[in-house]
């Protein structure tokens, strides 16, 4: 199976690798995994007072497609509102990265990670 140039670019030069402090009330963290292949993805967002995602980062342990999917979505969600980020679907990730059918689960993980990070952020905001 050959990876697309976009997958290879994001795999070899991943964007936004890292982590934010979980104690920051403006940070939402999403940790998701796929038992089928062992991929684990942690995606974090930092949201400003206007509800715009001003920064995002990730740490992914998995295949090239999982890393590329994480890297891509961190680029996509920066500057978006929570609502806009929630609307990102795995099918858009598949299309952009030209993922083969056997790697579609990686794009689903990325979509799930976005939703989990947003859910965590919202639950922190509701507590304050």
Curated annotation (Swiss-Prot):
A molecular-function term among this protein's GO annotations: iron ion binding
Cellular component terms per the entry's GO annotation: cytoplasm
GO BP annotation list: iron-sulfur cluster assembly
Top-level taxon: Bacteria
A Pfam family matched in the record: NifU_N
InterPro entries: ISCU, NIF_FeS_clus_asmbl_NifU_N
TM region positions: none
NCBIfam families: iscU
Family indicated by similarity: Belongs to the NifU family.
Subunit structure, interactors included: Forms a heterotetramer with IscS; each subunit of the IscS dimer contacts an IscU monomer.
Function as written in the Swiss-Prot or TrEMBL entry: A scaffold on which IscS assembles Fe-S clusters. Subsequently gives the nascent cluster to other proteins. It is likely that Fe-S cluster coordination is flexible as the role of this complex is to build and then hand off Fe-S clusters.
PANTHER family the UniProt entry points to: IRON-SULFUR CLUSTER ASSEMBLY ENZYME NIFU HOMOLOG (PTHR10093)
Protein name according to UniProt: Iron-sulfur cluster assembly scaffold protein IscU
Lineage summary: Bacteria, Pseudomonadati, Pseudomonadota, Gammaproteobacteria, Enterobacterales
